């Protein structure tokens, strides 16, 4: 039966007319089968369930303002809409209780959603009965994440950030020119190319490279670039 639902995502499937006290549920999910199955199952439980329009972030937020969902089921990998983590805060600010339903196994990414206001998260790999039960708990405003678990996740997130800040500290000592040279080296540019682009001598560029190596406490250009990738410096300075 579910195979018949694998076509284009329906924008709205309402099984019954909503009764008083129904809680609107918005499903922010681009997987058609899962989204449509959730709509049918939740509608059968008396919820007004609707699939979000994912044509743009602006359209999605306008739909939230109009539909006023009490609960939003949020995937984190939204294709052209980008990272769903960034959607948690604006959705909660619009009054929704956000439950993350995602295939990600990145513990810190999930912890960040909790920090931003999500009431909990559940893997897409969980049995559908568990997923439905968890959603209904959120609808009923029952906790789905214990205080201890929440504290543990946020503590892990703080620890990871402290480590990253420590690892990035040497890079903060680089001058703007040294940062540019390091970025150029990561792109595979040669000393003469870097010098020509900056209209400086090759000796100047080599001096700047020596400065980079000394500040990062590495012995070669390759090590400097590898370290920058490892600690996420390029991601922080695109």
Where on the chain are the PLM-derived regions?
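Conserved acidic carboxylate
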Residues: 29-31
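Helix-turn-helix DNA-binding segment
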Residues: 162-204
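Short amphipathic alpha-helix used as the core "switch/output" element in two-component signaling
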Residues: 82-96
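Recognition helix of helix-turn-helix DNA-binding domains
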Residues: 188-223, 227
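Short, flexible helix-to-coil linker/hinge segments that flank and couple to helix-turn-helix
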Residues: 110-114, 120, 124-172, 176
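Short hydrophobic/Thr-rich beta-strand motif most characteristic of the beta2 strand and flanking loop
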Residues: 47-57, 63, 218
């Amino acid at each position: 039966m579910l195979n018949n639902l694998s076509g284009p995502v329906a924008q709205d499937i309402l099984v019954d007319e909503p009764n008083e006290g129904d809680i609107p549920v918005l499903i922010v999910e681009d997987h058609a089968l899962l989204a449509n199955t959730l709509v049918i199952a939740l509608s059968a439980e008396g919820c007004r369930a609707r699939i979000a329009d994912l044509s743009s972030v602006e359209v999605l937020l306008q739909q939230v303002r109009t539909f006023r969902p009490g609960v939003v089921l949020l995937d984190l990998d939204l294709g052209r809409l980008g990272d769903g983590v960034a959607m948690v805060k604006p959705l909660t600010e619009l009054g929704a209780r956000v439950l993350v339903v995602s295939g990600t196994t990145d513990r810190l990414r999930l912890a960040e959603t909790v920090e931003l206001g999500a009431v909990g998260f559940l893997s897409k790999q969980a049995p559908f009965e568990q997923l439905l039960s968890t959603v209904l708990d959120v609808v009923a405003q029952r906790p789905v994440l214990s205080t201890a678990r929440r504290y543990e996740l946020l503590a892990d997130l703080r620890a990871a950030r402290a480590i990253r800040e420590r690892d990035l500290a040497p890079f903060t000592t680089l001058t703007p020119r040294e940062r540019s040279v390091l970025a150029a080296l990561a792109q595979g540019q040669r000393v003469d190319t870097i010098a020509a682009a900056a209209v400086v001598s090759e000796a100047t560029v080599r001096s700047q490279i020596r400065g980079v190596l000394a500040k990062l406490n590495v012995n070669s250009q390759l090590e400097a670039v590898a370290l920058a990738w490892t600690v996420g410096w390029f991601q922080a300075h695109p």
